Structure formats: C-alpha cells, structure tokens
Amino acid sequence: MNSKYQLPKDGGLVKDFAPKDIIHRYERMATRVFESEYYGVQYVADIICRMVHAHAENASVRDIYEELPPFVLGLATGRTPLGLYRELVKRYQAGEISFKNVAVYSLDEFYPMCGTDHQSRNYRIHDQFLKHVDILPENVHIPDGTISEQEV
C-alpha cells in the first residue's frame, strides 16, 4: 500500500509537518491524577451519584416528558471499573443511590459467546455490579453475543 502520508519513524504526528489536507486537532483533555485508586473511585462515584440525583430532581425534564426518562450510564468491563462498581454497590446498600431510573449500556461483547459464560462481558457486569443494585432488567443494554452471523 502506497500512501502519501507518513509518520515519523519514532511514531507520533509532528504538528508543523502534518499535511494540510488531513483533518486533525490537538485537544487538551482535562485530566485528574489521584493519590490512589480509592480517591479516584470516590471522586467518580460522587459525580455519578450527584448526576443521578440531579436527573431525578430536574423539573425541566419532568415538564417535557410525561414519564421521566432514565439517566443513561455507560459501563465498561475489565479490572479498571471494579473499584467503582464496588463503591456504587456500597452506596446503594447504604441507601445513598437508587438505580431504578438508570439505564446502563455496555459497548461491546465477545462473539460468539453466551451471556452466562464467565468470560462474557454481560456476565461480568451482572456479577460485579448489576445483580447487587435495584436496576430494572429492561434498562440493561448489553450486546447479544449469541446472535447469528446473518444478524450481525
């Protein structure tokens, strides 16, 4: 494959030498570094709890809809979110948050794989988080790893 665009051999894109016909931008994403995982988990759990409560109390949303739509929360799997899931479960058990009006979405699932397989993302999210809180089954959205290839 012959391309008119090349990157430096040591990697990365040199801003001043980027071809003018490539759409690109350099963003400075806000980043927070915490002393430990514990403090990072507390920070994120605080935000999620505040947002879920604010959504439930938002009068302007209630004026638009007859029934309050659920708060939408994206979920990841793997080791990274485990501390957060444990903290959210702890806060649910303490009565600090309810997930009854929260809809969760997972972006991916292994294919082909049944949701009850222990390696499945579906299984892990349920086992590590969802089965411990009061989320409604109809508000859980995880791709189905068992659909046929024709349906993919």
Language-model-detected regions and their locations in the chain:
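Generic structural signal for well-ordered, non-membrane alpha-helical segments
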Residues: 37, 41, 45, 81, ...
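N-terminal glycine-/serine-/threonine-rich phosphate-binding loop
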Residues: 1-73
